[in-house]
């Protein structure tokens, strides 16, 4: 077999590509089907990428598997078209028969899986890389309303339960439905303690300054009286 024919049998045609698709994205995507040797994204005379390209595998068996695995998946919202390359020995084969041919090629490995007790058709694993994801995905992740949207959370906002009234000096949230404050405004209010034993103590504490003032006034009166007595004694002496 000629080298050109051999390379054509190891290459797939990838069409209907979006303008933002790069060769690195195609490499990460088609690497799931097998090892690659070359990824080419066709460009026009101005250097702008066209809507198709070619992916060359290391083994020809990977071509049928890549068509069965990746044909029709969406890149940037557009389904890609994966076919045999024109000029290959299997280019006339319809795309819907690629899965059957892939099953025939890998029938030996499937039989070994059945002997080992594993399922005959293993589920392929699709690793998601940052290069294969559109930029809009990361843009919406960074938006604050994306992670804290009230629609995604429980009904509106669940406020924390207020502290029990038995705790002295506790505070609670009261809803104020005023037109200026808005329908969802809250204000802090101080709740007096419900323990009746605390009030006499406060009264006693308040009475202490009064008694002190009374004693000070009595002392003043006593001083004034003593001064008057001294004046009277002086007058009697004279």
From Swiss-Prot:
**Chain location of the short sequence motif Bipartite nuclear localization signal per the record:** 202-237
Q: Which GO terms describe its cellular component?
A: nuclear speck; nucleoplasm; nucleus
- Show the PROSITE patterns listed in the entry: RRM
Q: Region (Disordered) spans which residues?
A: 172-238
The UniProt entry's GO biological process terms, in alphabetical order, are: cell differentiation; cellular response to oxidative stress; mRNA processing; regulation of alternative mRNA splicing, via spliceosome; RNA splicing
* UniProt-recorded name of the protein: Splicing regulator RBM11
Quaternary state and interactors: Homodimer.
Query: Which residue intervals are annotated with compositional bias (Basic residues) in the record?
Result: 228-238
Keywords noted in UniProt = Developmental protein, Differentiation, mRNA processing, mRNA splicing, Nucleus, RNA-binding
> Origin organism of this chain?
Mus musculus
Q: What does this protein do?
A: Tissue-specific splicing factor with potential implication in the regulation of alternative splicing during neuron and germ cell differentiation. Antagonizes SRSF1-mediated BCL-X splicing. May affect the choice of alternative 5' splice sites by binding to specific sequences in exons and antagonizing the SR protein SRSF1.
Query: Which tissues is this chain's protein expressed in?
Result: Selectively expressed in brain, cerebellum and testis, and to a lower extent in kidney.
Q: Please give the InterPro entries that the UniProt record associates with this protein.
A: NEXT_complex_subunit (IPR052285), Nucleotide-bd_a/b_plait_sf (IPR012677), RBD_domain_sf (IPR035979), RBM11_RRM (IPR034501), RRM_dom (IPR000504)
